[in-house]
């Protein structure tokens, strides 16, 4: 009986101590770009809005497009080898903020939420933007994305007036200063 209990305890400890293996990667191959297109489409479907005003299909066809290094970034998150999330950063011109970039397409699949992937992706994109010497990072999000807005505020973003036309009611616009001032971090990640 004692050996069974010890074996069960060892098995339980091994199962609970095995943390998921999370990896952030930059897509480089045709299959990785196809996976990026698929998860971007999943993201758009989850929003429940038509992104045609952002030329979404043209963006997908041209990947990496504006998200190409060195000024842009395109990230996929995997958990134990399974595609779990995505995010991107691109230069942003013709806005009222000098030397700006924009965080785009931050999305974590529902089955992988609660692991901190959204924070990891957002932090990695902000780190990239700082290394690329951007002054500010902008983003927009929707009214019903309360958890995302909470994350953005925790990362130092503040609400601002609209920086571009968005026909979707309830859009929120946020900005984070990148060239000075303290902001919370969760550790540095390399792209």
Q: Which residues does each predicted region cover?
A:
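Acetyl-CoA-dependent GNAT
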Residues: 22-110, 122-124, 128, 161-165, ...
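C-terminal "cap" of GNAT-fold acetyltransferases
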Residues: 21-23, 135-191
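Active-site acidic-Proline motif in GNAT/NAT acetyltransferases
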Residues: 109-111, 115, 143-144
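Residues forming the Rossmann-fold NAD(P)(H) cofactor-binding site
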Residues: 115, 119, 123
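Short coil/turn segments at alpha/beta junctions that flank glycine-rich nucleotide-binding fingerprints
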Residues: 115, 131-135
């Amino acid at each position: 009986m004692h050996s069974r209990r010890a074996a069960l305890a060892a098995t339980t400890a091994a199962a609970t101590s095995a943390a998921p293996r999370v990896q952030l990667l930059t897509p480089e191959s045709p299959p990785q770009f196809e996976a990026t297109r698929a998860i971007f489409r999943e993201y758009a479907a989850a929003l429940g809005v038509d992104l045609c005003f952002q030329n979404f299909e043209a963006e997908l066809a041209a990947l990496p497009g504006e998200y190409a290094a060195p000024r842009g970034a395109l990230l996929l998150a995997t958990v134990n080898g399974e595609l779990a999330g995505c995010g991107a950063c691109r230069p942003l011109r013709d806005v009222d903020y000098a030397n700006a970039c924009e965080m785009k397409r931050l999305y974590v699949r529902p089955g992988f939420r609660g692991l901190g992937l959204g924070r990891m992706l957002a932090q990695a994109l902000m780190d990239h933007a700082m290394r690329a010497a951007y002054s500010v990072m902008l983003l927009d999000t929707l009214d019903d994305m309360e958890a995302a807005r909470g994350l953005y505020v925790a990362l130092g973003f503040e609400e601002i007036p609209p920086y571009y036309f968005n026909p979707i009611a309830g859009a929120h616009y946020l900005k984070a200063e990148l060239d000075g001032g303290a902001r919370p971090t969760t550790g540095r990640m390399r792209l």
